[in-house]
């Protein structure tokens, strides 16, 4: 089961709602996953379509409990192994579909004319409880969230730009920073930051999924920190090894060209130590001297040795 399905299954458990909350959730679901249709005799019907049976059952229950609409759930079998079955909740004309659609904000009536309403109805977001339930409904109807092990991405998909922009504004009232983009004929409201996705899951009441995502975030952060430390240590080790190889090459050149005994005593001591202990750090080399010399002092002497070797190379040319 995908992480997105887990989230939706979790939030479908909220079935004990007030009438206003039920209207807000149905509005969220129906405005993004519903289709308005007409029969041959021009009688209106409305279908909610979903691949998740839990969403179909929730829609069925909310319609029955709060509107006394006893509809049915139809299953459209998929012939493809890769595709899921489609679950349809169909509300016919004789079930009072027109009044229902006006109440949930799918339709609006102005000057005797009934038209589709592409806005976020004010009634659905007038208080915090309804606003949260409405966002939850939109997520159930047209939302998805990626596997947090791979990437952080949560989105809502709708076919109407005005609705997408208004929904983004509603989401952002919680201090989030959702953005809207067009994807072919759809408009997508999305969040890409892990912390903001956690906040959104909290808003819609997906607390178990929130904890799972937080655990993934913590583990990923720990892995990233370990990788950074390993990379840093590897880089430092590589620099140390390269420097030691370069220093030994310079010392051997001096030994061949003029002999180490020609070096000042303080440089000769360090040169011999470096030859005898090629894997030791500068700090460890310094501690072998009597009296001990600090890391910067050893580094300074080795630089002087390398400078002498460089001058010998130039003379050799």
From Swiss-Prot:
Keyword presence, DNA-binding: yes
InterPro entries given in the database record: Homing_endonucl, Intein_endonuc_central, Sporu_reg_WhiA_N_dom, Sporulation_regulator_WhiA, Sporulation_regulator_WhiA_C, WhiA_LAGLIDADG_dom
GO molecular function terms listed in the Swiss-Prot or TrEMBL record: DNA binding; endonuclease activity
BP terms from Gene Ontology: cell division; regulation of sporulation
Chain residues forming the annotated DNA-binding region: 281-314
Alphabetic keyword roster: Cell cycle, Cell division, DNA-binding
Origin superkingdom: Bacteria
Family: Belongs to the WhiA family.
Family annotation (PANTHER family): CELL DIVISION PROTEIN WHIA-RELATED
Function: Involved in cell division and chromosome segregation.
Protein's name according to its UniProt entry: Probable cell division protein WhiA
Organism: Clostridium novyi (strain NT)
Lineage summary: Bacteria, Bacillati, Bacillota, Clostridia, Eubacteriales
